[in-house]
């Protein structure tokens, strides 16, 4: 889920390349809630949380199979039911009403985008005429979903589903055979990728749609992989990878493209309404201002790297600090960093991170195979 952010808030952070002291670390240890697992299951993980505290993610059942799940605001877990044709499903987001969104699949390549409604019922999102499969990738608070659909010949068209589940195909660049919508903002603006020949590096077009109208944001020479991580109003963030597979982070202000300085170890996860992007620059959690300045965020003592993974409407962020072991963290809008506790020491190789933060500052994540919530 992407959230529109109305203001840029000054984070008391370390300037990239400077020796200024970092923001203070919050010493008070916050509470942690273990969200639990399905009956008989042993593992769970979160993906997203809405502002009412509804959480979605996955959990293993008693047979060890991964299932999509939703926790209500009282932290009660429920398995999300599969459509009759489906054999498995994944969930990626939740809207303001508590509806969960994901994808289901079954035999013979059957695959459909799906919404799990707040009342527990399941809605398979519409299939555009002439297409055989669908996949959803992003949703906004209003329940508008974007993704793509496949034809029999395996060409791909970008799709937007409204809150009723009705599908609209979005145009690609001229002659496009593969087009995918990958991000949507709260105003309904959409961004993604469109290409004529999937194996031609110079033909990977970054695109956006406003009220369904296509804008070609151009290509990056030598690009072997293109993706969009977010859109917020006039700003789009994305990634390109050259032959060496390093990752270069990009931002568009309207149609004007800029690249994060510092080489090919950069990733962006979120962008606010003023164009400040958040993610990882040079292995450190950072924000990249609309003016082009990279500002490194403070880390807990003993940690040298990390990444911002989520942003809320008030400028608070969440993510992970990295050393020999990973540590979920939350940054306030003023730049204070808090190391988020977890119930028992997980193995060093287990997944440990904060995956989302809602507009009330509540963070969800995972440590040691357990879904966790930090109020």
Where are these regions (language model features)?
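Secretory targeting and sorting signals
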Residues: 1-27
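Residue-level hotspots at or immediately adjacent to binding/recognition sites across diverse folds
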Residues: 4, 22-375
């Amino acid at each position: 889920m992407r959230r529109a952010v109305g203001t840029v808030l000054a984070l008391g952070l370390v300037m990239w390349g400077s020796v200024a002291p970092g923001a203070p670390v919050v010493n008070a240890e916050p509470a942690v809630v273990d969200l639990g697992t399905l009956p008989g299951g042993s593992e769970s993980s979160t993906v997203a949380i809405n502002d009412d505290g509804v959480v979605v993610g996955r959990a293993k059942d008693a047979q060890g199979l991964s299932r999509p799940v939703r926790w209500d605001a009282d932290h009660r877990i429920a398995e999300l039911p599969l459509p009759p044709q489906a054999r498995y499903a994944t969930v990626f987001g939740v809207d303001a009403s508590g509806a969960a969104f994901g994808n289901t699949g079954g035999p013979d390549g059957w695959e459909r985008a799906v919404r799990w409604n707040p009342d527990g019922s399941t809605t398979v999102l519409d299939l555009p005429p002439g297409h055989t499969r669908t996949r959803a990738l992003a949703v906004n608070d209003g329940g508008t979903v974007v993704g793509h659909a496949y034809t029999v010949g395996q060409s791909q068209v970008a799709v937007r589903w409204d809150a009723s589940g009705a599908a609209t195909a979005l145009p690609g660049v001229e002659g496009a055979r593969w087009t995918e919508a990958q991000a949507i903002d709260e105003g309904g603006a959409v961004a993604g990728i469109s290409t004529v020949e999937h194996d031609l590096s110079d033909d990977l077009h970054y695109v956006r749609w406003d009220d369904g109208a296509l804008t070609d944001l151009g290509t990056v020479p030598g690009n072997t992989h293109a993706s969009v991580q977010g859109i917020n109003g006039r700003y789009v963030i994305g990634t390109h990878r050259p032959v060496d597979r390093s990752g270069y982070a990009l931002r568009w202000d309207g149609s004007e493209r800029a690249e994060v300085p510092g080489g090919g170890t950069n990733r962006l996860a979120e962008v606010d309404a003023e164009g400040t992007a958040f993610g990882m620059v040079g292995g450190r959690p950072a924000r990249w201002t609309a003016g082009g300045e990279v500002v490194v965020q403070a880390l807990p003592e003993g940690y040298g790297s990390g990444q911002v993974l989520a942003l809320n409407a008030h400028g608070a962020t969440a993510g992970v600090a990295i050393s020999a072991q990973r540590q979920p963290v939350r940054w306030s809008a003023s730049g204070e960093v808090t190391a988020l506790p977890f119930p028992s020491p997980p193995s060093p190789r287990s997944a440990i991170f904060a995956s989302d933060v809602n507009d009330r500052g509540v963070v969800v994540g995972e440590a040691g195979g357990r879904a966790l919530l930090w109020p």
